[in-house]
């Protein structure tokens, strides 16, 4: 698996106007059609371009090794779980290396991944994940994000709240020396959360993968080695 985009950059594709399509949906379609990571994901069999963000995080921080237990929050359609499954060499029925994936949306089956179509904020979801783990987790991943409304401050706060919930959950289930990786949007309100994370992990970094769109304020919180 590589993040090399050689051969995936095509000529610019224009999107014809349509009375049935809003301006925002036309802009989204144009962006998708001209995104080399979308093309690369389709050719290489990944379910979303987000797979390359996790690949970049791993390439820089070396977070995955074989025989790990991983929790993937906000997992649909499954791009991160696909990457994690390959990197830990997950197989169905192996209790030592497995991935637990959770999302409101259905996740099509992935080898070595146990998926739950659940709201992470429902009372029984945490217990469901803990029972499925049959022990502690080595990594908690969260690519959860609220539906954006185009108002940066609001989008920032909403996604930050999701990150805080994922962090509190990670503290409950992570092994000592475990890792926590989560998406946040820059906006200024994240400093309090960062201070909390730094008290619990030996190394805390911000990272923006090259596969993250330049215009996006998203970055990834990389917290390594739970104290």
From Swiss-Prot:
The active site is at 183 (proton acceptor). The lineage of its organism: Bacteria, Pseudomonadati, Pseudomonadota, Alphaproteobacteria, Rickettsiales. It comes from the Bacteria. It comes from Rickettsia bellii (strain OSU 85-389). One of its GO terms (molecular function) is rRNA (uridine-2'-O-)-methyltransferase activity. GO terms for cellular component: cytoplasm. S-adenosyl-L-methionine binds at residues 78, 80, 103, 119, 143. Coiled coil: none annotated. Keywords: Cytoplasm, Methyltransferase, rRNA processing, S-adenosyl-L-methionine, Transferase. It catalyses: uridine(2552) in 23S rRNA + S-adenosyl-L-methionine = 2'-O-methyluridine(2552) in 23S rRNA + S-adenosyl-L-homocysteine + H(+). SUPFAM superfamilies: S-adenosyl-L-methionine-dependent methyltransferases. InterPro entries: RNA_methyltr_RlmE, RNA_MeTrfase_FtsJ_dom, rRNA-MeTfrase_E, SAM-dependent_MTases_sf. Specifically methylates the uridine in position 2552 of 23S rRNA at the 2'-O position of the ribose in the fully assembled 50S ribosomal subunit. Its main location: cytoplasm. Pfam families: FtsJ (PF01728). It is found in: Cytoplasm. This is Ribosomal RNA large subunit methyltransferase E. Its EC number is 2.1.1.166. The keyword Metal-binding does not apply. Belongs to the class I-like SAM-binding methyltransferase superfamily. RNA methyltransferase RlmE family.
């Amino acid at each position: 698996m590589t993040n090399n985009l050689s051969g995936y950059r095509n000529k610019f594709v224009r999107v014809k106007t349509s009375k049935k399509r809003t301006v925002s949906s036309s802009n989204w379609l144009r962006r998708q059609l001209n995104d080399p990571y979308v093309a690369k994901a389709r050719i290489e069999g990944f379910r979303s371009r987000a797979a390359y963000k996790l690949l970049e995080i791993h390439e820089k921080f070396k977070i995955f090794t074989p025989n790990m237990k991983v929790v993937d929050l906000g997992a649909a359609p499954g791009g991160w779980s696909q990457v994690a499954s390959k990197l830990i060499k997950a197989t169905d029925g192996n209790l030592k290396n497995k991935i637990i994936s959770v999302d409101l949306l259905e996740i099509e089956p992935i080898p070595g991944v146990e998926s739950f179509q659940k709201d992470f904020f429902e009372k029984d979801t945490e217990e469901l994940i803990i029972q499925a783990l049959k022990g502690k987790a080595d990594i908690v991943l969260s690519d959860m994000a609220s539906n954006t409304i185009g108002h940066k401050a609001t989008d920032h706060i909403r996604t930050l709240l999701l990150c805080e919930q994922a962090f509190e959950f990670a503290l409950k289930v992570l092994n000592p020396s475990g890792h926590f990786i989560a998406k946040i949007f820059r906006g200024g309100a994240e400093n309090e959360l960062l201070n909390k994370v730094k008290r619990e992990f030996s190394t805390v970094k911000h990272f923006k993968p090259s596969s993250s769109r330049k215009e996006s304020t998203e970055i990834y919180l990389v917290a390594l080695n739970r104290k």
